């Protein structure tokens, strides 16, 4: 018995896998850069993750009020620039994303993640946030995938006392 190989179908499946991987890498690089926002951050690298015709917005009651909406590449750049002053807004910032869903349709894609963000600010306060991310991506002429429309919606947000403790880790007895 001989199986007929449909090369067009195999190529389409391979392109889907490559698109998923590129989209995932784009969002993860975005988070890595946001974890280290300070006066030395290369905003050009961050903004290279965005399509030239892009939108970044907070949605829902809390994040629409806190973040607002930025309707151009330059306005998004300026928003991130405000986080990169000499005295950084964040002393510690770590983003964790999970529950990923990516749907690719040829040259565009819709994706979503749950995001957990742990932060300590320059004033010493610490915060725990969880948000739903809905992100549209656009395939570029060179084949790369970039953020077209980034939306973040708060699920919960709360202050915490601190993140790091010198207390010993509780471990099971080795006896």
Question: What is the predicted role of each segment?
Answer:
Residues 1-36, 40-49:
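Short, low-complexity N-terminal intrinsically disordered segments enriched in polar/charged residues
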């Amino acid at each position: 018995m001989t199986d007929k190989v449909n090369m067009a179908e195999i190529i389409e499946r391979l392109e889907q896998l490559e698109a998923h991987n590129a989209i995932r890498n784009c969002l993860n690089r975005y988070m890595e850069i946001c974890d280290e926002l300070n006066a030395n951050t290369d905003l050009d690298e961050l903004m290279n993750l965005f399509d030239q015709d892009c939108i970044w917005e907070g949605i829902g009651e809390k994040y629409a009020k806190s973040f607002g909406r930025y309707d151009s590449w330059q306005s998004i750049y300026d928003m991130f620039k405000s986080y990169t002053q000499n005295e950084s807004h964040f002393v510690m910032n770590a983003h964790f994303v999970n529950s990923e869903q990516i749907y690719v349709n040829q040259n565009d894609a819709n994706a979503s993640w749950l995001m957990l963000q742990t932060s300590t600010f320059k004033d010493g306060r610490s915060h725990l946030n969880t948000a739903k991310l809905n992100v549209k991506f656009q395939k570029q002429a060179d084949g790369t995938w970039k953020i077209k429309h980034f939306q973040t919606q708060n699920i919960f947000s709360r202050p915490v006392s601190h993140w790091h403790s010198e207390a010993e880790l509780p471990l099971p007895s080795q006896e």
